[in-house]
Amino acid sequence: MKLTNNFSLEELTVSQTALRNGIDNTPSSEHIENLRLLCENILQPLREDYNLPLVVSSGYRSKKLAGLVGSKITSQHCSGCAADFTIPGVDNKKVFKHIVENLPMDQVILEYYTEENGGWIHVSYVPNGRGQALTKDKEGYKTW
């Protein structure tokens, strides 16, 4: 099922951990709608702004999958509102700043970024979001 021109439901729900452990990671219709909104408002605009594919490392997580990967069941991944991604060949700090300055995100986190290791970006969308920008490293979260 296509969510936008460049993003499919499968791309935002596939999980090797779920497959290896026999976990059903099928989202509800409400979660699918949240994923569609995330794609329409954040991921697809990024795809078009950079004219490069995004590699989604984590999208929707069922509560069972969240527990298995050490995530909280209150994570926005569990409601279909969040995704973790990179854009190969583009510095994650640059993408992070672009999101902060241009897109209607709820939360964006530049995770484990160093110049040697680009880390990844966590981004979430809900209508009328908080616009919260953070960084995260081994010592925890910091406001951007």
Task: For the regions a language model picked out, list residue spans one by one.
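Glycine-rich, flexible loop/turn motifs
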Residues: 3-5, 65, 74
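Catalytic cores and adjacent binding grooves of peptidoglycan-active enzymes
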Residues: 74, 79, 87-144
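Surface-exposed loop/turn and secondary-structure junction residues enriched for glycine/proline
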Residues: 12-15, 22, 26, 63, ...
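Extended, low-complexity, intrinsically disordered C-terminal regulatory tails
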Residues: 41-70
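Short connector loops at helix/strand junctions that flank enzyme active sites
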Residues: 49-51, 78-82
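A broad, low-specificity signal marking well-ordered, structured residues that form hydrophobic/aromatic
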Residues: 54, 83, 121
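Extracytoplasmic cell-surface/polysaccharide-interacting catalytic and binding patches
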Residues: 1-47, 138-144
